């Protein structure tokens, strides 16, 4: 049996994409990404999701090799986002007798991507409904807004497999050999992270299932130590930091002065015993990593110059991203730079005050141009407040 296959009856038919540069046209994926799809072979054959059109040829080749002349009876649509549903049209045309399995929201959205009346080929399921394939039975669990409204997951009871849609996914092509942990946090916080309440609801449903294997739509099939992965998702979706004592130091700098101040602040934090400072240049590093670190660390320092009477764009973009991903339950400090009419701290404060459960250090310091000896005392005070 192919190492990628889940079992003799559940076959992996997905495909790697190693030429993609930006996932969702915004997240760098230097090691590519996998579009996972699975085939259950029983008295009835069911395809679990399709793949992005970018990988359709390889996917169809893999599928045909496993079907060996059979036609699938069902296509289960767990998620309509184009990286998983982009090849539905190809399958509808290739197998005219195949039926589509989805929920009411699935079928209300489907014509937006694949115009036409598919009602005669649609099997609508709701929470708890089961679909027998023979020895295998799929039970459907609704997972709205993890991370689209139509999302559902499927539990196969005979082999105790959870087909988890985007849940438990990660970046990286399978051929890269990366572990799940290498990119799972960056994937979660940037793709799913906003929807912690909905992830918690799904985890509560999953707790009632005997799960031995998790089959996500991106990344490796998870077979061992499932408590590790479930525990990570529980922690992340409760917005609790993995490293409560660590500090994200995120800065933007125009001509290097704020960068110099950031290096000084990093030294001060480390001298005061901070176990780890995640030091991120927002102008030059992947902001998705900065978002990941913001959620991993229990504390954060934001350092930015004033620009056009407001906040420098790199910092503005980052703080908007944190707001949109519902960053919360953290302690934060602000340092601005402005030679005249400094305004960066006011804008940053506005972002933070709009977030939930953010404790802001009382000292906010303004650097005027180059960092000077007189700035050190204020930075020492901010570090003490942040680490207390």
Q: Where do the model's predicted regions map?
A:
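Conserved beta-strand hairpin/beta-sheet module of binuclear metal-dependent hydrolase folds
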Residues: 3-64, 153-156, 160-164, 258
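Metallo-beta-lactamase
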Residues: 4-8, 102-151, 195-203
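Active-site metal-binding motif and surrounding structural segment of the metallo-beta-lactamase
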Residues: 43, 54-101
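Structural motif
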Residues: 44-46, 74, 136, 160-163, ...
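Active-site neighborhood of phospho(di)ester-bond hydrolases with catalytic His/Asp-centered motifs
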Residues: 48-50, 72-80, 100-103, 162-165, ...
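Short N-terminal or domain-adjacent regulatory/targeting segments
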Residues: 215-243, 317
